[in-house]
Amino acid sequence: GLMDGIRRGTRCAVCEDPVTQPRIGRVNPTLGQERQLAAKPVAKKKRVMVVGGGPAGMECACTLSERGHEVTLYEKTGALGGRIKLAAMIKSGGCEEVMHIFNHLTAMIEKSDVEVRLKTEVDEQLIRQEAPDAVVVAASSPYRIPDIPGIHRKNVFTIPMMSKLAQVPLKMFGPDKLASMSEKFFPVGKRIVIWGAGAEGAQCAEFMRKRGKDIVLVAEDGDVGGLIPLKYKERIEPWFNRAGVRVVRDATVAEFGKQGALLRFSQGGEELVPCDSMMVMLPEQRDPALFDMAASPVDEASAIGPTLGGESELPPRAFADGR
């Protein structure tokens, strides 16, 4: 509807975060820089390939098209939006309205002249075949999944694995309905070790605890919450304390076996934590391979959003990079 054409805030508190200077908006990358980042018409029209249909790629494709370029957006899966719907499910029932992001970007793509090609994996041969003037790579970087003993056990879950498992249910039921259904059944064990206490790990710990799971959250350093805006981040650990979530700092998982997860502390010592399942929630890490491949056949190439890894994988930077 008409509301989807408006960049509605999601109550994420990014624009209020004193840590982020200059201030930025998660869904409005032009906040405070409206003149500098206005989509001005280009002097020379180009044919542009945008690789990756997540928030950064969708924002980039729309902006380039608005400026007058001929844009084709490529996504290797069957749907645009990246992991937005999965994030909306995890945050369902809270204060954030994550689906505003998906609805707005989808509406903008539909209104634009951007050509969308789903289920299309971009390789060097395709780029040479299409012969674009420029390529923008906005595809996800790989998540860090350390090769420890037991990492391939069937009761170990990674972010890419959970994203894939959730694709069909999310399409069938939507984030809110699926979140409600998960309160009655979620296909993991009762006792869970979550490895990684950044934004993904902390929010996963809250989601799972609300579904009656016993949680041990393993932080590789002293920080819990990562790049979650300060307004919400400062509330996380008090909630964990009240809810009975155990936080283990300065530790890593050395092995995962039948008895549970073997933690190894940075100051020395080990602890075996009995558990039924382990979730690996470590952050993305930059892998230049895709960009290097995409850049080789063309004169102009850029990498944005999740391709850069680290902070750029998160929506605020993804939108800004896409702009």
What does each of the following model-derived ranges do?
Residues 98-145, 153, 158-161, 169-190, ...:
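A Rossmann-like FAD-binding core segment of flavoenzymes
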Residues 13-30, 72-79, 85, 147, ...:
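Iron-sulfur cluster-binding cysteine motifs and their immediate structural context
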Residues 1-44:
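Cysteine-cluster motifs in flexible loop/terminal segments that predominantly coordinate metals
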Residues 50-119, 191, 197-231, 246, ...:
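Beta1-alpha1 glycine-rich phosphate/pyrophosphate-binding loop at the start
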Residues 89-93, 154, 233-236, 320-321:
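Short, hinge-like loop/turn segments at secondary-structure boundaries
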Residues 297-323:
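Short FAD-binding loop at a beta-strand-to-alpha-helix junction that anchors the flavin cofactor
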Residues 42, 81, 88, 134-141:
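Terminal amphipathic helices with adjacent charged low-complexity linkers/tails
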Residues 42-48, 188-190:
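A short, charged/proline- and glycine-enriched loop
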